[in-house]
């Protein structure tokens, strides 16, 4: 699994906080490591700041970001300052009643259709690193693209539930409309 140096991680996190900037293009390094999932944990957390919610579905504060099934982030989530959101792991079948964001890990790929249906019925923002997630109807995919973590956004899926994304995020992401 690729790794990130703490300075690269800090630089990327700072860029994300300041409007994402060029942080998604920072090269991975070989020194002291932070895992691929450490970077994805930060993105999962920061994405909540770039989603516009429908008027009839305003989220509570703090947000609850849920991970279903096996948590791929390990202890990376515990290292993130959680002032605007909390993380919860939900074992399948998973109670999603208090969730606003739903991360569906690769370990749940065979149940993807079920999770997407449940998330749509609850109007949750869906995020995953399952290959092809956005093409399959998920809202935000976090693929590993060489040595970078990318972002793929399916605007059609998001709009179906009334969500829209900040223009800064859309400029940095690969956007599909299906």
Explain the meaning of each model-derived region.
Residues 2-18, 24-178:
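Short hydrophobic alpha-helices and adjacent helix-cap/hinge residues
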């Amino acid at each position: 699994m690729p790794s990130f140096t703490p300075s690269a991680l800090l630089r990327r996190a700072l860029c994300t906080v300041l409007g994402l900037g060029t942080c998604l293009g920072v090269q991975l390094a070989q020194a002291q490591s932070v895992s691929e999932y450490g970077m994805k944990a930060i993105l999962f957390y920061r994405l909540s700041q770039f989603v516009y919610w429908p008027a009839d579905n305003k989220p509570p504060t703090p947000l609850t970001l849920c991970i279903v099934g096996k948590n791929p982030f390990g202890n990376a989530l515990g290292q993130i300052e959680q002032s605007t959101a909390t993380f919860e792991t939900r074992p399948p079948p998973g109670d999603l009643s208090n969730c606003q964001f739903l991360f569906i890990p690769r370990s749940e790929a065979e149940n993807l259709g079920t999770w997407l249906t449940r998330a749509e019925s609850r109007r949750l923002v869906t995020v995953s690193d399952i290959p092809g997630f956005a093409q399959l109807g998920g809202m935000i995919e976090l693929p590993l693209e060489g040595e970078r973590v990318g972002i793929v956004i399916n605007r059609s899926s998001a709009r179906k539930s009334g969500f829209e994304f900040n223009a800064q995020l859309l400029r940095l992401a690969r956007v599909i409309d299906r």
